Curated annotation (Swiss-Prot):
The keyword Mitochondrion applies. Coiled coil: none annotated. GO terms for biological process: RNA modification. Keywords: Mitochondrion, Repeat, Transit peptide. This is Pentatricopeptide repeat-containing protein At3g26782, mitochondrial. PROSITE patterns: PPR (PS51375).
C-alpha cells in the first residue's frame, strides 16, 4: 500500500492500527513494515498519536524512540503525544528525556508542548518543574493555565491553585482576547476552593460559574455539589438548586446531593433522592451510591432501610467491596446492632485499616471496650498498621469505659511503637478519659503539657468533666479559654449555666443567660429520631406538631403513673431554671427522647427493640426513666446520643451509668 497524501496516510495508519492491531494483535514492527512510510515523520506522528489516544502508552513511547533512532527531524506535533504517554506511565525519566529533546529542537516554548510538559510533571508530582515550564511560556493560553491549576489541585496544593486562578483573572482582564476558562479548568478551581478554609470562597467561585454560564453542565455542577457537601456556606438549599439545574444528571450528581443531605442530617431527603434514582432507568447506581445511602442510614438510625440497602449490596455482589463493606459495618454499629456489624466484618474477605477501625469504633461507642481492645491487637497481628483515626477509636473506647490505665498505655505507644504523632483528637480523648474518671487535675496538667495549642474540643471535654464532678473553679478556667477560641458556641454557655445551677448559684446562671441574650445566641433545639416503616420521625422537646401527639402524651401520662408506683423520683438537676420543683418535673416529662420512646412502644409489636437517636447528650432524668420503662414494659431500648450508645434492658443500661 502506498499513500501519497499526508492526510490520507494519517487516516490510513489510524484506521489500520484500530482494526488490525486490536483484532489480529500484530506487533508494532509488523505494522510499520507493512503500512508505514518510515522515512516520513508525519507517518510516525500519526502512529504515536493513535497509540497514545488508545491508551497504549508504552508502545507510543517505543514508536517515538524508533522515530528518533532513524534521525528524523521531529515536528511540533511529535512531542505532545509522546509526553502524554510519559504522563500515563508516570515515567518521569522518559518525560525528562523527551523534554530535553523538545528543548534541543526548539519546541519548548510551543504552547502545546509546554502544556503537555506541565501535565506530565504535575502527574509525576514534580510541581516545581511544572511551574518552571509554566513561567517560561512567553504567551500562555487557557490550556496552559488550566494545566497548571489542575496540577496544583491534583497534588493537593489548593491554596496555590486558587492563587493561580486569581492570577488568571488578572491576566484575562488585561487581555483584549479575553481567555475563557473551560469546564475542565473550573472543575479544578472549584475542587481547590472547597479545600481552602476561607470564608465565602466556594460561594465566590459559584457566582463566577453562573456568570460564565457553566452552572448547568454536569461536570461543573457535580463539583459544586461536592464543594457544598464539604461545607459551603450556601447550605443544603443552594446545593439542591444546583442539582435541579443540572441538565443531564448522572450518577455522580445523585451521589453528591445524597451526600449533602446525609451530612446535613436530612436522611429522609437523601432516601427520597435514592428512591428517585432507583426508579430512573437511565442512571444506574454503584458502590459509592450505596455507601452514601448507608451514611444517611447511619445518621438517622433507620435500621430497616439499612437492611434493605444491605440486601441490595448482596444482590449486586458488592459485599466484598472494601468501601461498601466498611459502610455496612459503620451503619449497623450506628443503628445499635454491633453484633450484626461484627458478622459483616467477619465475612469481609479484604479488610483495610478503615474496616478494622470502623469495627473498633463500633465496639467503643457501644461500651464494649474489652472487645475493642481485643480486636486492636488482632488488627496489628494481621499486618494492618493502625493510623491516626484508629488510635482515636481505641482511646475513645477506653474513655467510654473509664479504662485510664489502658488509655495511657496506648497513648504512649502511638509514637514510640507505631510512629503516629498524637494530635488534638488523641489529647481530647485522654482529657475526656481522665476527666470523666475524676482525675480533673491530671487532665488539666496534660493540657498544660501539650506541644500544640489546645482547641475547643480539648477545653470542652474538660468543661464537661467539671459538670460531672461539680468543679466550678476549673470550669471557669475552661470556659474562659473556650470563649477566647469561640465565643459564639451556645453549648459552652449552657454547660457553664448547668454547672452554676448544680451549685445553686442562680445569679450566675442568670448572668450567663443575659450574656447569651445580648449576643443573640440561641440554644440549638434537642431532638430525637425514630424510624418506623421506612419513615424517620423527628421529635422536639414538648412537641406539638406530630400527628399522634395527643395519644403520645396520654401514653406518657400513664407511663408516668407506673413510674411513680415503681419508685421513680425525678432528677431535676438537669433543669437549668430557678423555678419550683413541680415546674421542673413538668419540663422533664416532655423531653424529646421520652416522646420518641413512647411513640416507639405504641407503634411496634411487644417484645421488639426500639431504636432512638438523640442529637444531644441524654440527661440524667431521661436516663433513669428509660431504664425503669425497659423493666415496666419488658422491652429493650437502644438510644444513641451525642456521646455513645445506651442499651436499656431489664431496668439497667449498658453504660453502667458512666456516660
Amino acid at each position: 500500500m502506498k499513500v501519497r497524501s499526508k492526510k490520507a496516510l494519517f487516516c490510513s495508519v489510524s484506521r489500520l492500527l484500530h482494526t488490525e492491531r486490536h483484532t489480529e494483535r500484530q506487533n508494532l514492527t509488523t505494522l510499520f513494515n507493512r503500512y508505514v512510510d518510515k522515512t516520513d515523520v508525519f507517518s510516525w506522528n500519526s502512529v504515536i498519536a493513535d497509540l497514545a489516544r488508545s491508551g497504549d502508552s508504552a508502545e507510543a513511547l517505543l514508536a517515538f524512540s524508533s522515530m528518533r533512532k532513524l534521525s528524523l527531524y521531529p515536528t511540533r506535533s511529535s512531542f505532545p503525544c509522546a509526553i502524554k504517554a510519559c504522563s500515563s506511565l508516570f515515567d518521569i525519566f522518559s518525560g525528562k528525556q523527551t523534554h530535553q529533546q523538545a528543548f534541543v529542537f526548539g519546541y519548548q516554548s510551543d504552547i502545546f508542548v509546554s502544556s503537555a510538559l506541565i501535565v506530565m510533571y504535575s502527574t509525576c508530582g514534580k510541581l516545581e518543574d511544572a511551574r518552571k515550564v509554566f513561567d517560561e511560556i512567553p504567551k500562555r493560553n487557557i490550556v496552559s493555565w488550566t494545566s497548571m491549576i489542575r496540577g496544583y489541585d491534583l497534588n493537593g496544593n489548593a491554596l496555590d491553585a486558587v492563587s493561580l486562578f486569581k492570577d488568571l483573572l488578572v491576566d484575562e482582564n488585561d487581555d483584549d482576547d479575553a481567555m475563557f476558562l473551560d469546564s475542565m479548568g473550573l472543575v479544578s478551581v472549584i475542587s481547590a476552593c472547597s479545600r481552602v478554609p476561607a470564608k465565602g470562597l466556594t460561594e465566590s467561585i459559584h457566582s463566577f460559574v453562573i456568570k460564565r454560564g457553566f452552572d448547568r453542565g454536569v461536570s461543573v455542577g457535580n463539583t459544586l455539589l461536592d464543594a457544598y457537601a464539604k461545607g459551603g456556606e450556601g447550605g443544603v438549599a443552594v446545593a439542591r438548586k444546583i442539582f435541579d439545574q443540572i441538565v443531564d444528571k448522572d450518577r455522580v450528581s445523585y451521589n453528591s446531593i445524597m451526600s449533602v443531605y446525609a451530612q446535613s442530617g436530612m436522611s429522609n431527603e437523601a432516601f427520597e433522592v435514592f428512591r428517585r434514582l432507583v426508579k430512573n432507568k437511565v442512571v444506574t447506581f454503584n458502590a459509592i451510591t450505596l455507601s452514601t445511602v448507608l451514611l444517611a442510614v447511619s445518621h438517622s438510625g433507620a435500621l430497616r432501610i439499612g437492611k434493605c440497602i444491605h440486601d441490595q449490596v448482596i444482590r449486586m455482589g458488592l459485599e466484598d467491596d472494601v468501601i461498601v463493606g466498611t459502610s455496612i459495618i459503620d451503619m449497623y454499629c450506628k443503628c445499635g446492632r454491633v453484633e450484626t456489624a461484627r458478622k459483616a466484618f467477619d465475612r469481609m474477605k479484604n479488610k483495610n485499616v478503615r474496616s478494622w477501625t470502623a469495627m473498633i469504633a463500633g465496639y467503643g461507642m457501644h461500651g464494649h471496650a474489652a472487645k475493642a481492645l481485643e480486636l486492636f491487637p488482632a488488627m496489628i497481628d494481621s499486618g494492618v498498621r493502625p493510623n491516626y483515626i484508629t488510635f482515636v477509636s481505641v482511646l475513645a473506647a477506653c474513655s467510654h469505659a473509664g479504662l485510664h490505665v489502658e488509655g495511657w498505655r496506648w497513648f504512649n505507644a502511638m509514637k514510640g511503637r507505631f510512629g503516629v504523632e498524637p494530635g488534638l483528637e488523641h489529647y481530647g480523648c485522654m482529657v475526656d478519659l481522665l476527666g470523666r474518671a475524676g482525675f480533673l487535675q491530671k487532665a488539666y496538667d496534660l493540657i498544660q503539657r501539650m506541644k500544640m495549642k489546645p482547641d475547643s474540643i480539648i477545653w470542652s471535654s474538660l468543661l464537661a468533666a467539671c459538670r460531672i464532678h461539680k468543679n466550678v473553679e476549673l470550669a471557669e478556667i475552661s470556659v474562659a479559654r473556650l470563649f477566647e477560641l469561640d465565643s459564639s458556641n451556645c453549648g459552652y454557655y449552657m454547660l457553664l449555666s448547668h454547672i452554676y445551677a448544680d451549685a445553686g448559684r442562680w445569679k450566675d446562671v442568670e448572668r450567663v443567660r443575659m450574656i447569651m441574650k445580648n449576643r443573640g445566641l440561641v440554644k440549638p433545639p434537642g431532638f430525637s429520631l425514630l424510624e418506623l416503616n421506612g419513615e424517620v420521625h423527628v421529635f422536639l422537646i414538648g412537641d406539638e406538631e406530630h400527628p399522634q401527639r395527643e395519644k403520645i402524651y396520654e401514653f406518657l401520662a400513664e407511663l408516668n403513673r407506673k413510674l411513680l408506683e415503681a419508685g421513680y423520683v425525678s432528677n431535676t438537676s438537669s433543669v437549668c431554671h430557678d423555678v419550683d420543683e413541680e415546674e421542673k418535673e413538668m419540663t422533664l416529662r416532655v423531653h424529646s427522647e421520652k416522646l420518641a420512646i413512647a411513640f416507639g412502644i405504641m407503634n411496634t409489636v411487644p417484645g421488639s427493640t426500639v431504636n432512638v437517636v438523640k442529637n444531644l447528650r441524654v440527661c440524667s432524668d431521661c436516663h433513669n426513666v428509660i431504664k425503669l420503662i425497659s423493666k415496666i414494659v419488658d422491652r429493650e431500648f437502644v438510644v444513641r446520643d451525642a456521646k455513645r450508645f445506651h442499651h436499656f434492658k431489664d431496668g439497667g443500661c449498658s453504660c453502667g451509668d458512666y456516660w
